[in-house]
Curated annotation (Swiss-Prot):
Belongs to the peptidase A1 family. Probable GPI-anchored aspartic-type endopeptidase. It comes from Aspergillus oryzae (strain ATCC 42149 / RIB 40). Glycans are attached at N72, N99, N111, N132, N272, N329, N403. The keyword Cell membrane applies. Its main location: membrane. GO terms for biological process: proteolysis. It is a lipid-anchor; GPI-anchor. This is Probable aspartic-type endopeptidase opsB. A lipid is attached at A463 (GPI-anchor amidated alanine). Its EC number is 3.4.23.-.
Length: 487
């Protein structure tokens, strides 16, 4: 594959505003491109709970296996290969130590994602024993912060800091690329931030600005990509529109924006939920969450209109798999930008699960948020092209262009209004309260991880029975039309 920019292929794989910006086109734009790949999660809700923690571009392809996105990197000298979960909702890169309690167990659960052996790397250096991340259900990892050389596609960053878990309950390491203020040593210990991956790329001259764009592609695609330091104009429709990121307790720590409208439409009907008392709402953009978590009242209305069966013990909504063939859209409004999600992107394979009438049951990609901040996870992000501009504390959105094979890479420059072709939304809603609650993938809970609760061979742990404080009447749904799960 020949390209005129620096490409790091790591198979991990209307409008009112200012005039659009001058495009930053160079023969050799500083970008880093990474492939990302999707992987299946047997129980996406349990997995979300377990992993919720609280002229320069780099592109990485993303591997897509329906409910989780991975990227492949190498660490150390010589190189040690790892497959990590890409997560915009956290900020630390961490991986399991080869001799960790979990990886050393009989069933060798770390084989698929790999592990890191510091003693085998000549470029390894110990930093501290401060790494300790705990998730909302008590799972987590503890160990050391270290530095070593990271290779991500064709780029190399030396003396890169990351966490190594010697005690862990997840076989899957995480590549967190959020704000440095959300790093474990900052949030839990009050220490100064270190340069995580996007910031380290800027520091090493690989990209100009601490910004990246994410293109997950559709549910049927195996791969997507993340482009550090640039945008790919062939991956979205229309224009990018820019919104301010909301602070949490006065600090920029998570990718939270204001959701102002939600609607459901088909060829024959339209249901608008924008009058709900739950809107406008603070919503977190989180690639580490498989599903989308919306305010309870909105989910109740959607479930009623679609006939979704809510199973309270697992916290999952189920629909007939045939629903994916219907011409139905869920539309999200963010002051001005409108992102449309087709129903086929919200109907997820649940294996051989069936309703009592024999119809195949699929997981519905929207579930109640309970008391936690609403989360726009992968069932939303696949339909949106998102630019995360950490330098300017802004998010730019457009509707994704599915299965595009063309590329037009433009570099994100420095300073204000640096995202190519993006326009600022005039008078965006900002009056939303973001509490940063919940340990989404990576979001530290502030608790210390001290024990490993019954890890499975895949690194999973038993999940709570259901979402916190979800109305019991959600259990109804499709039972009224004969769709009752057969257990």
């Amino acid at each position: 594959m020949q390209k005129s920019w620096l490409v790091l292929l790591v198979a991990c794989l209307g409008l009112q505003g200012t005039t659009a910006l001058t495009l930053h086109r160079r023969d050799l734009p500083a970008v880093v491109s990474l492939d990302i790949k999707r992987n299946n999660a047997v129980d996406p809700v349990a997995r979300d709970r377990m992993r919720r923690k609280r002229d320069k571009t780099v592109e990485q392809n993303l591997d897509n296996e329906e409910t989780l996105y991975f990227c492949n990197i190498t660490l150390g000298t010589p190189k040690q290969s790892l497959r990590l979960v890409l997560d915009t909702g956290s900020s630390d890169l961490w991986c399991n130590a080869a001799n960790s309690t979990l990886c050393s167990s009989r069933d060798q659960p770390c084989n698929a994602s790999g592990s890191y052996d510091p003693s085998s790397s000549s470029s390894y250096a110990y930093t501290s024993s401060d790494f300790n991340i705990s998730y909302a259900d008590g799972t987590g990892a503890a160990g050391d912060y270290v530095t070593d050389t990271i290779h991500i596609g064709g780029a190399t960053v030396k003396d890169f800091q990351f966490g190594v878990g010697y005690s862990s309950s997840s076989a899957e390491g995480v590549l967190g690329i959020g704000y440095t203020t959300n790093e474990v040593q900052v949030g839990r210990l009050g220490k100064s931030a270190y340069a995580n991956l996007p910031q380290a790329m800027v520091k090493n001259g690989l990209i100009q600005s601490n910004a990246y764009s994410l293109w997950l592609n559709d549910l049927g695609a195996d791969t997507g990509s993340i482009l550090f330091g640039g945008v790919n104009t062939e991956k979205y429709h229309g224009e990018l529109q820019t919104l301010p990121i909301q602070t949490v307790n006065g600090v920029y720590s998570e990718f939270i924006i204001a959701l102002t409208g939600v609607s459901l439409s088909s060829a024959s009907s339209h249901h608008n939920y924008s009058s709900s008392d739950a809107l406008p709402a603070a919503v977190l953009l989180d690639s580490g969450s498989s599903l989308t978590y919306l305010p309870n009242s909105i989910v109740q209305d959607i479930y009623d209109d679609l006939g979704v069966t809510y199973e309270s013990s697992s916290g999952v909504g189920y629909v007939p798999c045939s629903l994916a063939q219907q011409n139905i859209n869920v539309t999200y409004t963010f002051s001005s930008p409108i992102i449309t999600v087709g129903i086929d992107e919200l109907v997820l394979d649940a294996g051989d699960l069936r309703f009592r009438n024999g119809a195949r049951a699929c997981i519905f990609g929207i579930v109640p948020a309970g008391d936690s901040t609403a989360v726009l996870g992968d069932t939303f992000l696949r339909s949106a092209y998102v630019v995360y501009d950490l330098s300017n504390n802004e998010i730019s959105l457009a509707n994704t262009k599915f299965n595009s094979t063309k590329d037009n890479i433009l570099e994100i420059g420095t300073g204000d209004d640096s995202v190519p072709g993006a326009t600022q939304v005039s008078n965006p809603v900002t009056s939303v309260v973001a509490d940063g609650s919940g340990a989404r993938i990576g979001g530290p809970t502030g608790e210390i991880f001290t024990d490993i609760p019954s890890a499975t061979s895949s690194g999973g742990a038993a999940a709570p029975a259901g979402p916190t404080d979800v109305p019991k009447h959600l259990v109804l749904g499709a039972a009224a039309i004969g769709y009752v799960l057969a257990f």
